[in-house]
UniProtKB/Swiss-Prot annotation:
Species of origin: Chromohalobacter salexigens (strain ATCC BAA-138 / DSM 3043 / CIP 106854 / NCIMB 13768 / 1H11)
HAMAP family, per the entry: OadC (MF_01299)
Keywords: Decarboxylase, Lyase, Magnesium, Metal-binding
Keyword Metal-binding among UniProt keywords: yes
Subunit annotation: Homotetramer; dimer of dimers.
Catalytic activities: oxaloacetate + H(+) = pyruvate + CO2
GO terms classed as biological process: oxaloacetate metabolic process; propionate catabolic process, 2-methylcitrate cycle; pyruvate biosynthetic process
Binding site for substrate: 50, 159, 235
Function: Catalyzes the decarboxylation of oxaloacetate into pyruvate. Seems to play a role in maintaining cellular concentrations of bicarbonate and pyruvate.
Designated name of the protein: Oxaloacetate decarboxylase
Enzyme Commission no: 4.1.1.112
Keyword Lipoprotein among record annotations: no
Gene3D superfamilies membership: Phosphoenolpyruvate-binding domains
Family: Belongs to the isocitrate lyase/PEP mutase superfamily. Oxaloacetate decarboxylase family.
Length: 287
């Protein structure tokens, strides 16, 4: 089957945003997973930054992967995908000028959309790992992203962590990003539907929600009614692949089955505890 053009896939994603439905993403992390997701009927996929870090570096989600490494993985997926893919571009790999470079490279890679977040990344000395950059800086990044885009069909999505802010500050951020001209808002840290309603009320553009499977946010019809068009429940397919690989290799070595789950395996083999210790020792990063 022929692979659609990058522009066609971007228009497909635009159609999702313009619809009245809510779509759940497939976690795609390599060309094979992208093909499987399309064959199973998923309408949209996402290449997560955390998943790319695990897949490319076997490292945790500490903003360690470089733009070039992330773009290489996105390009591999882009060569074969038959569904639009959102790239989780983290903080844009630096300041507003770095964001412009990120947009250029990911557009060439063929992604249909990308998110730029306002988290203070990489983690800074003495800060919490969840701290956000100043609002003015965040707006500058979004404006830079829009300026760097060549194909207007590629969607630029502003991402912020509503769980780290009070409602007033969160609304101020999303409204500022909407005013900057982004195509959608991605919210992380939404607690429940009451919280979502307060954040969505002043917005006129579509929403993307990262829920990590939050049971308080499972009603797809209600999500759609509030303007949520894309939901990321997590990256279960990738973690299932880790678990399947581990169990298969243990069996080949005639080692008894393990009780470790996929999350525990990812923690062990990404050496997450070491990275956390280094961040505390060398950077005084707060959890």
């Amino acid at each position: 089957m022929a692979t659609p053009s990058q522009h066609d896939l971007r228009n497909d994603f635009r159609a999702l945003l313009a619809s009245s439905e809510c779509y759940f993403t497939a976690s795609v992390f390599d060309p094979m997973s992208a093909r499987i997701a399309a064959d199973l009927g998923f309408e949209v996929g996402i290449l997560g930054g955390s998943v790319a870090s695990l897949q490319v570096l076997a490292a945790p989600d500490f903003a360690l992967i470089t733009l070039s490494e992330f773009v290489e993985q996105a390009t591999r997926i882009g060569r074969v995908t038959r569904l639009p893919v959102i790239a989780d571009a983290d903080h844009g790999y630096g300041n507003a000028l770095n964001v412009m470079r990120t947009i250029t490279e990911l557009e060439r890679a063929g992604v249909a959309a990308l998110t730029i977040e306002d988290t203070l990344l990489p983690a800074q000395y003495g800060h919490k790992s969840t701290d956000l950059i100043p609002l003015d800086e965040g707006v500058g990044k979004m404006r830079a992203a829009l300026e760097a885009r060549i194909d207007p069909a590629m969607a630029i999505i502003a991402r912020t962590n509503a769980g780290q802010l009070d409602d007033e500050a969160a609304v101020e951020r999303v409204c500022a990003y909407q005013a900057a001209g982004v195509d959608a808002i991605c919210l992380v840290g939404v607690r429940d539907f009451d919280h979502l309603e307060r954040l969505a009320a002043p917005l006129d553009i579509p929403l993307m929600l990262v829920t990590y499977g939050n049971p308080e946010l499972r009603d797809r019809a209600r999500l759609a009614a509030l303007g949520v068009r894309v939901v990321v429940n997590g990256h279960a397919a990738y973690f299932a692949a880790i678990k399947a690989t581990y169990d298969c290799l243990r069996e080949q070595r005639d080692i008894a089955a393990s009780e470790l789950n996929a999350s525990q395996l990812a923690t062990r083999y990404s050496t997450l505890d070491e990275y956390r210790e280094w961040a505390r020792d060398y950077m005084d990063v707060k959890e």
